[in-house]
Amino acid sequence: MSYSLGPGPLPPIIRKLIIANVVAFLVTSVTPGIMLWFGLRPADVFGRLHLWQPVTYMFLHGGLFHLLFNMLALWMFGVELERMWGSRYFLRYYFVTGVGAAATTLVLSLVPMAGGEQLYYSLTVGASGAVYGLLLAYGLYFPDRPIYLYLIFPIPAKYFVMIVGAISFFSSLGGASGVAHTAHLGGLLAGYLYLKGPRTRLMAEFAYRFEKWQINRSRRRFDVYTGGRGSDRDKRIH
């Protein structure tokens, strides 16, 4: 009889992401000024064209607890997804949700009703946007899998996603709190659109039709034509 704790050993992409985040944290601990250069700040993206920030901010964290929480969540929710999707699709989804979270922050920084002026000059760091995207995917693919709130109360994953989504939405309307709720909301939204949006259905239909065309083409190509009964001379394989 064997026992296991958690989703299991780290697959390759998650292992590399954790290493990259830890290395970035150690570097910023020695040279904290890097945060201002590689963190997400809408004023710098729009005003100074620091176009790398919507990607690089995902690898920076404001403190040890922030880093540990995100890496733990990456492990908890990401391992099964990477095994199911494969490393390439998982990595693409991770960056889509992380950059989508940054895009949401950038757009809302231009909306006065969403606290845009304050958000415009604020600095956002952390992998939370991508992690929230993974949480959404986990809830969609494993809706009845229990997630333990405060390590005590089991909640089905689909309801847990609804709860954190509602918290992120209403918190994003409530002004400054020191937490990037707009990025959390953006990660959830980007993940949903990527997995369930019109583009996904269109691409699935295209992939199905392309695969069907390839199968039919292969059948025509390898059909065996018989020139006469009992004779091998006129048989051809295309």
Give names to the regions the model predicted:
Residues 30, 76, 80, 139-144, ...:
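Structural signal for the C-terminal ends of transmembrane alpha-helices
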Residues 24-36:
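Alpha-helical transmembrane segments of multi-pass membrane proteins
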Residues 83, 141-153, 199-206:
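Alpha-helical transmembrane bundle and helix-membrane interface signal
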Residues 155-160:
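Select subsegments of transmembrane alpha-helices in polytopic membrane proteins
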Residues 3, 13, 54-138, 169, ...:
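Transmembrane helix-loop-helix
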Residues 1-13, 20-22, 168-238:
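C-terminal transmembrane module of polytopic alpha-helical membrane proteins
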Residues 34-59:
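Extracytosolic (periplasmic/ER-lumenal) interhelical loops and adjacent juxtamembrane/interface segments
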